[in-house]
């Protein structure tokens, strides 16, 4: 115990330093050096909106197109995210300014949007879509300057807080009129690399910003060389899009370069730095204090009570007298009686082990910086493949538990483990994907990708689950310290607070309270297209979640056994996952208060994916709590003498 108390502060200090550290690039992600006037390619990623949750590819709208459209080959994670990276006609040269350039169209021949195109553009603007571009793999950002008064200052001066919004707004609405951002002012920052005296300077792109503007056709002056002159001052009017008729306009852009002290290795800090890091720290510290405080209280109560009970049981010569006044020892002959549906229980727990291993490895690897944000889709790709390969551990744990519960049909149990949870996930995703297909969104998983996922499931995960299940079933089952009686003991009438649903509500509060702040930022990253890269904090929260789930599970199973109810297997699994109920409640609260979703399909997508999240979280926390309780029950019954 003393060694553990010495080890914990060192562990927390290491994690704090990891949380504080900046993002770094893993080997193999090399910087690109540009020379003067080298082309810097601007690519489009997708269009996104937090109101619809339906991404679209860039050319789903009538933007100017290059002579040849070329889509980048994407990994699994990029496809699942809805990214469709494609080239654009923007001509940008390293450290070369452009005042104003026409993207497409001529001086006497502007771009004409048909009625259908105008209606589509107007619809996307009213749905608050953002356009996402990249230059040298850096996403474009819009600078936001927020002003707040300084309370500590006597003159109440305004302080400027600079934040960055990912992407740029497609347009805006004002007094029931719709306006399109048809001029983009690109601001690219470069870092000059040190070179020898006789060598030419090289440059690296370290930031990519844009200032979107809406400029009316009549206010732009276009010459024969496709150059343009922007209107001066505030005399110009924005470019209106009337969805009921054809619209004429120009798409234009300008390029400005600025030298920066930002080094290439830290260029992502602009996008990943959050102004609310203190909130994370306060949340972590509060959770750690609460968990340690409750750990002390629960440990004192349970350990002192158990020591007293075990000492009394081991001293008593008359077992019958002991049984008349005892609690949890009364059910020693039934506590390890196999529950109903042992195959389903072991299958769910096997999937929970699979999830636990996958999440632990992903968070740990990401915390070390090995899943760089520059590697788009790497996080999701890694998670998918890890879940497949962790099937061997899930199968092994499920097979051994199934044999411990007196199961005999191991082949059927292995198939159930390999298909039950993944089948539910695939079924829900397939139904949602049909709706996304119907909206022609890039978020729809293409048919070849779906076939590839099925091949991964049945070609990698299922055989590995069978392999692990085979060895787990052949291994010696868990050694239960007491024998099970042939005739089940009658269970006395339980008090109201021992009700299963009440237990779920009580047990879920502590784990959810330890993580709900971090849950807010995760929801913001998922549903509001924000970056999330504070995996050091997330790893801390995950450790706290594991500890709190284990504690609550042990306490709940102890009180259940004291009430002489030995049916703890399923109940403990359900109660330990009680925090998933609070995650569902929080998801509903977030939907009502944070998101502006009113249409059916976006709402269906939100609650469909939320269902998957809650189900996965229930499996994860239920598995953690179950194995903690199982170890506890075996420990306490091994400590007493049973005749």
From Swiss-Prot:
Record membrane topology: Multi-pass membrane protein
Q: Provide the function of this protein.
A: Associates with proteins harboring glycine-rich transmembrane domains and ensures their efficient localization to the cell surface.
List the transmembrane segments.
Answer: 283-303, 348-368, 378-398, 418-438, 451-471, 503-523, 537-557, 572-592, 600-620
Q: Which residues lie on this side of the membrane: Extracellular?
A: 24-282, 369-377, 439-450, 524-536, 593-599
* Subcellular location per the Swiss-Prot or TrEMBL entry: Membrane; Golgi apparatus; Early endosome
Any one cellular component term from GO for this entry? early endosome
Q: List the InterPro entries hit by this protein, alphabetically.
A: EMP70 (IPR004240)
UniProt signal peptide: 1-23
Membrane topology, Cytoplasmic segments: 304-347, 399-417, 472-502, 558-571, 621-643
Protein name as catalogued: Transmembrane 9 superfamily member 4
Residues bearing Phosphotyrosine are: 313
- One Pfam family this chain carries? EMP70
Keywords annotated in UniProt: Endosome, Golgi apparatus, Membrane, Phosphoprotein, Signal, Transmembrane, Transmembrane helix
The main location is: membrane
A single GO BP term for this record reads: phagocytosis
The family this protein is said to belong to:
Belongs to the nonaspanin (TM9SF) (TC 9.A.2) family.
């Amino acid at each position: 115990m003393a060694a553990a108390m010495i080890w914990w502060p060192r562990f927390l200090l290491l994690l704090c330093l990891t949380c504080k550290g900046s993002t770094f690039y893993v080997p193999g992600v090399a910087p690109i050096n540009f020379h003067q006037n080298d082309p810097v390619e601007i690519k489009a990623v997708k269009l996104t909106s937090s109101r619809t949750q339906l991404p679209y590819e860039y050319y789903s709208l009538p933007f100017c197109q290059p002579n040849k459209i070329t889509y980048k080959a994407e990994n699994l994670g990029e496809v699942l995210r809805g990214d469709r990276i494609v080239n654009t006609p923007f001509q940008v040269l390293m450290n070369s300014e452009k005042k104003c350039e026409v993207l497409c169209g001529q001086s006497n021949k502007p771009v004409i949007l048909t009625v259908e195109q105008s209606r589509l553009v107007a619809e996307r603007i009213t749905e608050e879509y953002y356009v996402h571009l990249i230059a040298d793999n850096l996403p474009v950002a819009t600078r936001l300057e927020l002003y707040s008064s300084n309370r500590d200052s006597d003159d109440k001066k305004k302080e400027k807080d600079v934040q960055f919004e990912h992407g740029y707004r497609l347009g805006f609405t004002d007094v029931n009129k719709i306006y399109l951002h048809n001029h983009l002012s690109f601001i690219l920052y470069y870092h000059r690399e040190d070179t020898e005296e006789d060598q030419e300077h090289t440059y690296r792109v370290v930031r990519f910003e844009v200032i979107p503007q809406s400029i009316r056709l009549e206010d732009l002056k276009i010459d024969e060389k496709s150059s343009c002159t922007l209107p001066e001052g505030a005399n110009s009017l924005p470019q209106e899009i009337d969805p009921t008729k054809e619209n004429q306009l120009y798409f234009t852009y300008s390029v400005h370069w600025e030298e920066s002290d930002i080094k290439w290795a830290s260029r992502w800090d602009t996008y990943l730095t959050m102004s609310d890091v203190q909130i994370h720290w306060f949340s972590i510290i509060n959770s750690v204090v609460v968990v340690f405080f409750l750990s002390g209280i629960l440990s004192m109560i349970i350990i002192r009570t158990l020591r007293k009970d075990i000492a009394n049981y081991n001293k008593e010569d008359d077992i019958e007298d002991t049984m008349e006044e005892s609690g949890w020892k009364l059910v020693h002959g039934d506590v390890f009686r196999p529950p109903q549906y042992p195959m389903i229980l072991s299958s769910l727990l096997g999937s929970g082990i699979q999830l636990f291993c996958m999440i632990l490895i992903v968070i740990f690897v990401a915390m070390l910086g090995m899943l760089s944000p520059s590697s788009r889709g790497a996080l999701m790709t890694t998670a998918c493949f890890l879940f497949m390969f962790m099937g061997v551990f899930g199968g092994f744990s499920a097979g051994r538990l199934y044999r411990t519960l007196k199961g005999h049909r191991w082949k059927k149990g292995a198939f159930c483990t390999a298909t039950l949870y993944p089948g539910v996930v695939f079924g829900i995703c397939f139904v949602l994907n049909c709706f996304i297909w119907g909206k022609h969104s890039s978020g729809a998983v293409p048919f070849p990708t779906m076939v590839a996922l099925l091949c991964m499931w049945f070609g990698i995960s299922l055989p590995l689950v069978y392999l692990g299940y085979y060895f787990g079933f052949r291994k010696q089952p868990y050694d239960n310290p007491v024998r099970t009686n042939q005739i089940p003991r009658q269970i006395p009438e339980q008090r109201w607070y021992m009700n299963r649903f009440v237990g779920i509500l009580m047990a879920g509060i502590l784990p959810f309270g330890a993580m709900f702040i971090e849950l807010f930022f995760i929801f913001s990253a998922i549903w509001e297209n924000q970056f999330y890269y504070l995996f050091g904090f997330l790893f801390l929260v995950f450790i706290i979640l594991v500890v709190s789930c284990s504690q609550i599970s042990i306490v709940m199973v102890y009180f259940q056994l004291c009430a002489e109810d030995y049916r703890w297997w399923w109940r403990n699994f359900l109660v330990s996952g009680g925090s998933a109920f609070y995650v569902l409640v929080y998801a509903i609260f977030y939907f009502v208060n944070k998101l502006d979703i009113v249409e059916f399909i976006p709402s269906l997508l939100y609650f469909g994916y939320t269902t998957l999240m809650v189900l996965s979280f229930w499996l994860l926390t239920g598995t953690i709590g179950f194995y903690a309780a199982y170890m506890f029950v075996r420990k306490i019954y091994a400590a007493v003498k049973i005749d």
